[in-house]
């Protein structure tokens, strides 16, 4: 898996225990959205 790919972002979010967002699976979102979601979750931690 390449750093910064959609699959990488999904895997990183799953490591943090996040599999869904607003009732949708992470795989259904675009890469830029997953990047922003991961960044916001890191800031909250």
From Swiss-Prot:
InterPro entries: DUF2639. It comes from Bacillus subtilis (strain 168). Pfam families: DUF2639. This is Uncharacterized protein YflJ. It comes from the Bacteria.
């Amino acid at each position: 898996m390449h750093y910064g790919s959609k699959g990488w972002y999904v895997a990183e979010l799953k490591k943090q225990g996040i599999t869904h967002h607003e009732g949708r699976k992470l795989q259904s979102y675009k890469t830029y959205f997953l990047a922003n979601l991961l960044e916001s979750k890191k800031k909250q931690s």
